[in-house]
Structure formats: C-alpha cells, structure tokens
C-alpha cells in the first residue's frame, strides 16, 4: 500500500506544466503571422475570409456542410474558375469551429471528406470520457498542473493533429491561414493564436502545438479545465508595431480614438512577474462568431488606412463568410412556475450572454460593411466587400429547422444530426441573397451541361 502511494505521488509530481518557448527579441518577418500570410497569397486580387462559430460538433458539422455546399457553386474570380472553399485565404475558428478551422488550414480542399471520416463520424465525446475515467490517467489528473483540458488536447492530437506545432502549420498548410481564439479567464480578453499577438507575451508560437490552441478554444468552463500559457512579457523589447504608431499619434476625444488606445496600449500583460501565467478557456465567451477580430481591426485603423493596405496588396474584392451554428435557447423554463434546474441555470449563464453578444457583433459588422461599400462609390480604386451570413436561425420554417436548432452542444452527434446539419448548410448557401449576388457580380462559369447545349445549338 505504501509502495503504491509512493508511485502515485511520484506520478503526480512528474506531471508539470511545460512552458512555451520564449523569445529574446521580436522578428517581424518570421513566424506564424497573419499579415505575412496575406502578403504571400491573393493571386486573384480577392480576399476570402471564412468564420466558423462555436457550438461543439454542431458547429464543426455545419461549417463542414458549408464548405461542401460551396463546391456545388463555382464562380469566377478574376476570370479564374474556382470555389470559395478552394480560394479561402483566412479562416477564423472559435470553440467547436476551431476544430474545423485548424484542420481546414492544414489540409485545404482535402478537408472534404477527411474531416467527416476523422472527426464527425467518430464518437469524440466517448473517447474523452474514456480517457478521463481511465485509472492510468488518474495520477496525472491529480496533479495541480494537469486537467481535463490537457486531456482534451491529447485527444485532438490522437484524432486530428498529432504533434503538429504552429511552426509546422506555417510550413506545411495547404489551406487558408487559421486564426484560433481563446479567452483569458482572468482578464476576459480574447487571445488569438498568431505570432503578432504572442509577441506581446515574448513567446514563440511556432513551439506551441496546434492541438493545444484548439483545446484552449474549446474548453467550456466546468466541463473542461482551463489550459495554461506562460507569460514572458517585458523580456524581448516588444513595443507597439510601427504600423500601429500612426493611429496612436492623435490625442482626440472621439470614441474610435479612445478604443484604439485601449486596444494597442493595453498594459494588462506587460508585467510578467505580476502575471506569469494565463489560463485559457472557451473562445466563444468573448467572440462566438469570430467577427470581433475584424471589428477590432476596423476600430484600430481608419477606413483610409485599411483602403491603402488592401490596395497595396492589389485586393479589389473582400468576401467574408460567417457560419453561425447558434442553436435555440430553451424557453420551456418560462412556461412553468417550477424553479429551473441547475443544468438550466448553467446553460443560461453561458448561452444567453453569448447569444446577445453575437447578435450585437453581427449588427455592428453589417453596419461596418454597409458603411464601407457606401464609401467605395467615390474611391479611385473601389474595393467591394461582400458579407455572406449563414445562420441556423435563417432556415425556413420546417421540421429540419426545428431539429437543427435543437441539436445540443456536445462533442458527439448521431449520424442523423450530422446529415441534418449538412442539409441545412446546403439550404442556407442556396437561399443566401448575399452569396447569389456575389456570384452574379463575380460571374458564374458555364456548366458542362450549358456548354454542351450551346454547342448543339451552334451545330444546328
């Protein structure tokens, strides 16, 4: 008994947090950087951005269905026949959507059908519970520096990503540049897994495993434990990048100028001795749609600066696709006097603020797009922005809509639910007025059937 206890305690002591590699200086031309990826892409003068919301496997399945549906609607971008799935430059993923986003970045168009086989058809949730209840994992879970969030990372490694780091992803990705987001539970701030963001922590993102970022983004509080990230701020000479300095010169009193200062001169993480660690949880708590990443950039830069940046990269069209897997918040508690259950209270505590914040982000983004396009009428080189919003709530009234909106947030869905979400994605893409308008403006390639009919007509 004493020997067994000694082995147990020894195992616990061996499980310690492994810090991410630090940097001694910022290297702006190296690493997994968003701006570098944009500079190296855009061969067709069109910037295509995908956004996959949170929502567990429901979100991953709906996003996968949208990518599959886009392949049925080819379009012309600068005379080149392509699809949005094949042409995506950036993908933002949050919580369940981050699983698909990271895999899409790694495999590109081959995400179809690989992701369905490797993830959607697997009972990922059962595998997780099996690991959590395994006797062999109990010593590790007894460690104060190892938790269920770390087990989630291991399961993502076993199922999808292996030991791939962001350095590997930077070298070998076949798809769009992925921005995975989590939430710092102490500050409530969004943490994007890009080297631009990790510069402030004086950390080398290339050393971090992709599965850890996805696990952090997916770590729903209470169900999973937070994932730890070390903070080395103040030890690499980091300053606000030169490209941002211009927007900080003004001391005006406008709300936008105050917001710029708040975003760019945030001192919260500057003292790594006071805050040596971050504890990361579900990215959906701060930005369940992924839209805030773009809204923050719009708040930092004046439209004239954004215009100049896009023109410098020869971009004349921006396409933003938002896939929103938000389900129906139960209203049954309003139909009876009985005190809601503990589960109902937990769900309301998490889901209601997320739903309200998502609606506000959606309204702000639509207003931003409208204002941008209105300003382009007088631009010397107009840059058209298309916003394709695809939400389960936009499905037409039908049994399918009812079923889709009542699919729970879990990491396993039965085959029927996966098929419902794929069918829902087809309908949303087909009925989207924004997507159909984009196809009209960009041009639709001739289908083989139409070409054959035209050839027959010419013969006669």
Protein language model regions, located:
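Catalytic domains of lipid- and phosphate-ester/thioester hydrolases
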Residues: 12-460
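Sec-dependent bacterial lipoprotein signal peptides
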Residues: 1-13
